[in-house]
Amino acid sequence: MFNLASAPFAHNRKQTQTLMLLVILACLPGFLAQTWFFGWGTLIQTLLALVTALGCEALVLRLRGRPVKPALLDGSAALTAVLIGLSLPPLLPWWMLVIGTAFAIIIAKHLYGGLGQNLFNPAMVAYVLLLVSFPVQMTSWLPPSSIAAYDIGFGDAASVIFTGFSLDGYSMLQLKQGVDGLTMATPLDTLKTGLTQGLTASEVMTHKVFEGWGGIGWSWVNLGYLLGGLFLLQQKVINWRIPAAVLGSLLLASTLGYLATPDATATPMLHLFSGATMLGAFFIATDPVSASTTAKGRLVYGALIGLLVYLIRRFGGYPDAFAFAVLLANLCVPLIDSLTRPKVYGARRK
């Protein structure tokens, strides 16, 4: 019996449009949890990203002399927009999202030839571009609604995104405050800041934002994306090897790190159920174009992402490291595929 590996082209019986729609549908549980805990901004950002992505897709296709309607209906641009909208802070200024989304479609996707040709995950290229260019705004997350000092409705969220102030005149800095008057951040941000200030991990994690496995709200968001990821596995939209390797590698690395230096690192459960862990493992790392295509290669690729996530979270300057980890792993895909390609029957061993 011989192992066969698919070529880099898609051969799934499901049409591209169906696959893209299934992935977007699978995002729904995490999206609902994210909207529930962090407000309407997530919905507004996602809709704005959709309009921008589809507009840029149509413009570039027309300039390239390609058919516009089939490409718009295949769902690839829409999926990129959804992933961008879910990855960005809910109240990020609208023009930053437009810049990131346009860059993802025009540069990260079409500069390489369009659908199926991109070397890097377009959504993560957009995220990293914005994070490097606007680090303050990209780390300005709202506190979960249960501990927020201000109730932010749909109108307030839209007003902050498009004007910088809520309907009552509150700035983003004021809206970031929790009920205790302290400026809030994500659990991973809070931990990184506390460790930088000389506190131990156990001291930092007494903060109320760390309630639950991955922090208030974030545990449910990650459970939502985990549920969506299991749906994709059941539908055979994604291969199990990549998310299993990502989560397994991250769990192993974070467990060893926690056992070695418990006062200087997050718990394994916080690594798994905070930040973009489940979104990254099931929806971003599994991009069929930029991920490895061989069976062994997918395990290596996923394990590399999980290890890089831990190392960047532990030693790097950015608390949530999934975008950087995925892009670095994308760079390694040609080498990984070359080293893990099954031998052709009858080929002489070197």
Residue spans of the language-model regions?
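N-terminal signal-anchor module of multipass membrane proteins
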Residues: 1-62, 343-349
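C-terminal ends of transmembrane helices
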Residues: 4-7, 55-67, 105-116, 226-237, ...
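Alpha-helical transmembrane segments in multi-pass membrane proteins
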Residues: 22-29, 48-57, 76-81, 85, ...
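Structural signature of hydrophobic alpha-helical transmembrane segments
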Residues: 40-52, 91-100, 208-223, 265-277
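A generic, well-ordered mixed alpha/beta core segment in the N-terminal half of proteins
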Residues: 80-154
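Loop-to-transmembrane alpha-helix initiation sites
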Residues: 119-124, 269-277, 298-300, 316-327
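Long hydrophobic alpha-helical segments that form multi-pass transmembrane helix bundles
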Residues: 122-223
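A beta-strand-loop signature enriched in Asp, Gly, Thr, and Trp
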Residues: 243-295
